[in-house]
Amino acid sequence: MKKLFFLCLGLTATAATTAPVEGWLHMRGPLQTGVSLEKRLQDKIQIEDALWTVDLPGRSTPTVANGRIFIVGHLGEGADLQEGVFCLDADTGEKLWEHKFNDFLSDIIYTRYASSSPTIDPETGNLFYQGTQGLFASFTPDGKMLWQHSLMEALGRMTFPNGRTATPVVDRDLVITRGIMANWGSQGPPWDRFYGFDKKTGELVWAAKPGGRPKDSCFSSPALGWLDGKRVFYATTGDGSVVCANARTGEAIWQVPLFKAGINASV
């Protein structure tokens, strides 16, 4: 049975062109730390109090910037299945733009695990999206595509049923994502790999495999932090480890094996 995701928000919005970029910019919040900066929030939210609702199937976390809401969802079934990025007006729920892409993997089941969520760059307001079909792309706040990569074709990203895709993170000039990859040459054999792309051009800056050979899928999202004055990210991996890696190079700083199977929970 198809389940619907009901997006219900009551927000006071500012114009989409307002600078600086402010809002809930990442799945883990405005600073990508899992901490909200908001004060005096309501203890309870009732569906009856919603200013508007939008029916959109999906398991993405909405992100918000300058009066606009960005979310990933899916439409259609079977051969007509599409995944898309949608932009809504935060005041009214009106759809401002959308980009839909064919999800040619017929075994995707969106109602089980989490899918990737949009990430917003705090500097430019641009949006980053990794799709279940292997697309990794950047859009302006107005919906213009800036660059795109087919990670399956370019890097051999493997896919798994149920959506299993990580949410990208932004560190200054880089946007970082990950996946289980299997390819030729330097990108083979199958491994849990992380990639740093230039956020403005989409150029690949570094590729790294800070964990061991994967025993299972892993779609946790990296968490940024600082260690001894260096920008790092913490992540779980497909070999059952927790790793700390240099966010500027992807090089592992430490690795702690914990389990005999992949860990899908984010740090």
Which residue ranges define each predicted feature?
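A general lysine-centric signal
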Residues: 2-3, 199
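Sec-dependent N-terminal signal peptides
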Residues: 3-12
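Noncatalytic, solvent-exposed loop/strand surfaces
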Residues: 16-267
